[in-house]
Each structure stands twice: as C-alpha cells, then as structure tokens.
Amino acid sequence: MKIFSGLFTIFLCAYSFIAVGLAHSASALTKVTMTSGSASERDGVLYVAQDLGLFKKHGLDLTFVQVRNGPVAMSALSSGETQFHWGSVSGANLGAIAEGADLVFIAGFINRLSGMFVVNSQIKTPAELKGKSIAVNSLSGGGWIFSMLMLDYWGLVPERDKIQFRTLGDQAVMAQGVLTGSADGAFLGYTFGNMLRGKGFRVLADSEKLPIPYQGSGVIARRSFMISSPAIVDGVLRALLESSTFIRNPENKMQVMKSLAKALRFRRIEEAEEGYHSMVNLYEKKIYPSVEGVRNVIRLLGANNEKIRRLKAEDLVDDSAVRRMEKEGRF
C-alpha cells in the first residue's frame, strides 16, 4: 500500500504539473482579432496559417472575422475593437484615414491587382460595359476599388458611361449574381472567375497581366498599436510569412486545397484547385507595402474627394515591422 500510495502521489504531482503547464501555455496566448471583407484565394494565406496553428506557434490566439463592408472593419479597427485588418487599399480605409483615423499599411502580401473581370458572353469588349451593371461587395470596399481601377484603365467613367454598381455580397454571391443575370459582370478572384469561365462566361481581362500599380491584400493596423505592441505585430507577420512559404511548396498542395475549400465552403476539395494554382505564386516574398500602389488609388479617388486628394502615400505606410522580418532572415 505504501508503494501504491507513493506512486499515486508522484502521478498526482506530475499530472498537476502538466495541467498547470498547459493552462499557463493556453493563458499565455495573446488574444487578437483580424477582420477581412473578402473570401477568395487572396485570403488563403490566412486560412492556411489558422489551420496549421501558426498564429498559436507565435503566441497568438487570433480570431479571424469576416465583415460585410469596409467601413465596419475600419470603424472596429480605429476604435481598438480589433487589432488588424487584412485587405487592400480602398475607399473605406482611405476615407477613414482622411477623417483622422490612425491607420497604416504595415505589410503587403499581394502588391498588384489580382483577379479576373468576368462578364456575360454578350459583352465582347470593355466599351460594351457602358450602360451595364457590375456586382461589388460594397460601395467602398476592395471589390469596388478593383472594378474602379479596371474601368479607369479602360478609360471608362461610371457616371458618364451609366455603369451601375450592385452591392451583392462576398465573392460567392457576386459570382452567383453574374451567373443568374442580376449583374452583367464582376471583378472576381481566380477561383470563382474560372468557375464562371467554365460555364461560358467571358473573361474581359486578367488584371495581373495589366500594368496597374496597386497595394493589394496586406495587413493594416493602427500606428499607435504598432508602437505599443511590436511583439504582437511581429507574431502575425511571422505566421503569415511561414504560411506563404508553406503554400509555395508543391508537396503541401492537398493541405492548401483543403484549407481553401473549407474556408470557401466548397462541397468538394477538387473545386479549390483553380484557386490553389493561383495562390502558389500569388504572395510576395518581400512583403513591403507598395507606396506607388497606394498613391494610384489616392489619385483615382482624390479626383472627387478633396480630403483623400490631400493624403500622401508615404504617410500611409509603416514598414518598420517588415524591416524587422528582413533582419531576422525571414526573406
């Protein structure tokens, strides 16, 4: 009995030590929230990082929240309700900054316009978009600015050319809107764009083949948060860099497709293959934000908004955390 009692005591002590250690480990994770207004392969680096536990690896309990539109995300970020936003330069964030929000682009994972402008098969040229309708996620978010940049490149002006924007929802809903005829076209990521092409819809342009400067998907945060919480900022960037490296490795194809299929709610993993192929070379290795890309959108939106016109692109970018990543040898 003494031997049993002694072993039981040792076991109980060991169990208590492990339990306390696990509890301490769990409590040591810092809770942070990141928002995004889209759901496509552009966000795949986030999905993979979550599924692989890379944020936890770097001490973060990160909650990823999809919001319907940019203004809601910017309001939450500005108030401190959230700490990060994954997105591109848009009317929503430029408008918030123009009104005094303390927001900066801290990393650029996609520094170009990435996607396809898909239309019904009756439309053969960009000029035929006159008088037509375009599906967007919101009237100030990424989907809208993507479309505006494409129209600007083609020399089209929505007001003059009677082009209407229809707010439908996320990428899946926008694609469905084009499919059913609720809208004549939409700027879509490659996953949904190729799905429509396979059903006979026309791709007017692949934006990656066009010389349009743009700050695409990246990380936005409050400048004050960057100064007060550099360890959290660095943890997020390390996790995302490791995720993008994982995505580029062809051996990880099935895991990446599983993450994308789950996030986009596909019934079959195979439906994510088109998106996977675009993801492999989608993300920058050097994740410095694009000042020129920000400047291009200020030019476009500033034509009708004096406050945005007065913004300086250089003031909207803080690459200090990215420089720390480079010093660590992350790229």
Which role fits each region the language model picked out?
Residues 7-21:
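Bacterial N-terminal signal peptides
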Residues 227-309:
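Secondary-structure end/capping motifs
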Residues 298-331:
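Conserved C-terminal helix/tail region of periplasmic/extracytoplasmic solute-binding proteins
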Residues 27-180, 184-190, 203-207, 212-213:
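Short, glycine-/small- and polar/acidic-enriched structural segments
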